[in-house]
C-alpha cells in the first residue's frame, strides 16, 4: 500500500478515527477523468455509509450548459462504475441524486425530458429543489437579466409561480397529488402521448378516482412501477427504497 500521507487510506490509520464517510460533494465528473480508479474504489469500499449524494441536477444538455454542469452522460457513467464497484465488494449502497427544477434555461420541454429520464431509469426523487436566486451566482444573473452573461443571448426563465409548479410537479409525476399539474404541463407541451397506460407514459389516462380521458396518448395495457434501479439498469439495486433526507437550501451554481 502506498505511503502518501494524503492518500484516502491514511484517514483509516488515524488513532481514534473509526470511520470517515463522505455524504455529498463529490465532483463525479473530475473523478471520471482520473485514469487511476484507486480513489474511486476506496470511496465506494470505505467512505460511503449506505448512500452517496451527487448532483446531476438535470438531464437536458441545454439546461446543464446554463448550470455549468457536465452532461448527463457523465452521471450515467459514474453510476455504472459506482454500482459495479459496489457489487464487487458485495455491499448494498445507493446513489441519491440532487435534482433542480426551473433553473434559468429550463423550459417545460426540458422538465418533461427530465421526467422521462427519471422514469426510464426508475428514479423516484422524494425531494426536488426548485431554483431560487441567491447573490453572487451566474444563475442568479441569468434569472434577473434573462440573458446569458457569457454570450448575451436571451435565456428563458420560468418566474411565474404556476409555471414553476408545473416543472416541479413533472419531476414527481408519480405522486397522485401532482396529477392535475402534470396533465396540464403535458397538454400545454403537446405531449399527450405521455398520458395513458403505456410503458412510456408518465401519468395514467384517469386521475386517481376519476374518469378516463380519451384525449390521452398511451394505448398499452397495464401500469409501470418505479423500482429505483441505478442508471444503466444495474440490478445490484434490487428495488429497496433508500430513505432520503430533504435536500435543504440549494441555489444556483457559482462559477
Where are these predicted regions, by residue range?
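Ordered, helix-dominated protein-protein interaction surfaces in large eukaryotic regulatory proteins
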Residues: 13, 24, 84, 120, ...
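Acidic, low-complexity intrinsically disordered tails
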Residues: 202-255
Amino acid at each position: 500500500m502506498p505511503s502518501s500521507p494524503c492518500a484516502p487510506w491514511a484517514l483509516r490509520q488515524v488513532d481514534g478515527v473509526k470511520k470517515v464517510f463522505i455524504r455529498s460533494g463529490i465532483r463525479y465528473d473530475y473523478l471520471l477523468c482520473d485514469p487511476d480508479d484507486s480513489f474511486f474504489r476506496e470511496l465506494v469500499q470505505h467512505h460511503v455509509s449506505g448512500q452517496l449524494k451527487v448532483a446531476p441536477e438535470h438531464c437536458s444538455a441545454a439546461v446543464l450548459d446554463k448550470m455549468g454542469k457536465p452532461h448527463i452522460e457523465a452521471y450515467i457513467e459514474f453510476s455504472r462504475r459506482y454500482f459495479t464497484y459496489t457489487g464487487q465488494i458485495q455491499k448494498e449502497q445507493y446513489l441519491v441524486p440532487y435534482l433542480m427544477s426551473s433553473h434559468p434555461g429550463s423550459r417545460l420541454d426540458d422538465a418533461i425530458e427530465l421526467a422521462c429520464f427519471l422514469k426510464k431509469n426508475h428514479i423516484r426523487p422524494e425531494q426536488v429543489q426548485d431554483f431560487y436566486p441567491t447573490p453572487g451566482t451566474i444563475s442568479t444573473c441569468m434569472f434577473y437579466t434573462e440573458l446569458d452573461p457569457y454570450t448575451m443571448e436571451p435565456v428563458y426563465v420560468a418566474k411565474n409561480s404556476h409555471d414553476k409548479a408545473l416543472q416541479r410537479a413533472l419531476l414527481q409525476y408519480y405522486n397522485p397529488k401532482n396529477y392535475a399539474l402534470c396533465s396540464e404541463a403535458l397538454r400545454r407541451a403537446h405531449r399527450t402521448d405521455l398520458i395513458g397506460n403505456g410503458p412510456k407514459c408518465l401519468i395514467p389516462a384517469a386521475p386517481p378516482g376519476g374518469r378516463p380521458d380519451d384525449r390521452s396518448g398511451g394505448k398499452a395495457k397495464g401500469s409501470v412501477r418505479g423500482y429505483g434501479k441505478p442508471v444503466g439498469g444495474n440490478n445490484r439495486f434490487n428495488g429497496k427504497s433508500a430513505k432520503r433526507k430533504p435536500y435543504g437550501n440549494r441555489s444556483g451554481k457559482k462559477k
